[in-house]
């Protein structure tokens, strides 16, 4: 029975169930939303499903939401701000109960203004949107320290965007400053088309080929492309050149078991994001029914502490 609130006899329930089966009835979720009821649906916005991190994150989020009785609308923005905005508008028009976003586009004002539960993963969307993330700064330090311990004299950082917001870069710079080594930071923008990315990575590396002997790449696919470039130069990994990545997804560990990387707790990030979002949804429902516990609602708007990462040693360092 679609709505089981109130008393129904077993005989009535069976008759309704038979009628539903015969008519192939499907609840109209938007109509339910217009009547103030939950649509039991969540929007998930990711910048790409091509990177294993976001593919694995999506899988876990969808799985955890299904366990709680929610459907997931997966929106792949392809790293484009206009497409992300379109998906955001679409999700709002479909009256989803909440949104989980791992967007890579800064400045979308709607995240700060929509009256809907929102949680971000590894991105600061707004001071009012809780952010679930790993300890990126610690990960940057661990990666740089590992390269130096393995004998690297001048490790470079290869990342998607540089600046104070890049905490992996911050950790890398801290370690090199302590070792009195000048940082070498190379960038290939996150939104670079896949077909162009390998060529740009090679261009960046060739500019510093004579000056560096190791690379910390802030994602594992980039690290794999660095390994290919090193081998094309006739150098040996790790004897002549060392490489470490970041993410440690199941797919990469299966495809490239030799790659040294910093592993994020992706399943834990996904579960935390789901739990935090559903807590917000429950809190808003309680508020609308007269519960004025503002302290409890504020708790669900605070970002949790960053989750720890770990070094997965391989044969590339």
Predicted regions mapped to residue ranges:
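Alpha-helical structural signal in soluble globular domains
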Residues: 19, 60-64, 110, 167-179, ...
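Flexible loop/turn connectors
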Residues: 203-317
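Alpha-helical recognition/docking segments in bacterial nutrient-uptake
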Residues: 37, 41-145, 149, 204-210
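Conserved functional loop/turn residues at catalytic and ligand-binding sites
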Residues: 1, 24, 38, 69, ...
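Hinge/beta->alpha junction and helix N-cap segments in small-molecule ligand-binding domains
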Residues: 29, 47-56, 74-83, 132-142, ...
């Amino acid at each position: 029975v679609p709505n089981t609130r109130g008393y129904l006899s077993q005989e009535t329930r069976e008759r309704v169930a038979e009628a539903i089966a015969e008519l192939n009835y499907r609840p109209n979720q938007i109509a339910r939303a217009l009547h103030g009821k939950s649509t039991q649906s969540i929007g998930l916005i990711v910048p790409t499903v091509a990177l294993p991190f976001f593919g694995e994150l999506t899988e876990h989020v969808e799985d955890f939401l299904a366990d709680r009785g929610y459907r997931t609308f997966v929106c792949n923005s392809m790293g484009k701000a206009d497409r992300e905005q379109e998906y955001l508008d679409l999700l709002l028009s479909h009256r989803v109960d909440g949104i989980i976003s791992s967007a890579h586009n800064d400045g979308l004002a709607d995240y700060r203004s929509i009256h809907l539960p929102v949680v971000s993963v590894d991105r600061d969307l707004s001071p009012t949107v809780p952010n679930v993330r790993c300890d990126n700064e610690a990960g940057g330090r661990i990666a740089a320290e590992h390269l130096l311990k393995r004998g690297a004299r001048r490790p470079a950082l290869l990342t998607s965007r540089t600046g104070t917001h890049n905490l992996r870069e911050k950790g890398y710079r801290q370690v090199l400053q302590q070792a009195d080594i000048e940082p070498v930071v190379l960038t290939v923008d996150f939104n670079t088309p896949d077909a162009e990315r390998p060529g740009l990575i090679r261009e960046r590396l060739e500019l510093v080929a004579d000056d560096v002997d190791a690379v910390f790449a802030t994602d594992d696919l980039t690290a794999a492309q660095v390994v290919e470039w090193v081998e094309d130069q006739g150098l040996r990994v790790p004897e002549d050149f060392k490489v470490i990545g970041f993410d440690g997804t199941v797919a990469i560990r299966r495809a490239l078991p030799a790659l040294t990387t910093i592993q994020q707790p992706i399943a834990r990030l996904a579960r935390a994001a789901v739990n935090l979002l559903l807590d917000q949804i429950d809190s808003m429902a309680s508020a609308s029914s007269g519960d004025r516990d503002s302290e409890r609602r504020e708790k669900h708007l605070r970002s949790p502490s960053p989750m720890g990462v770990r070094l997965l040693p391989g044969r590339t360092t």
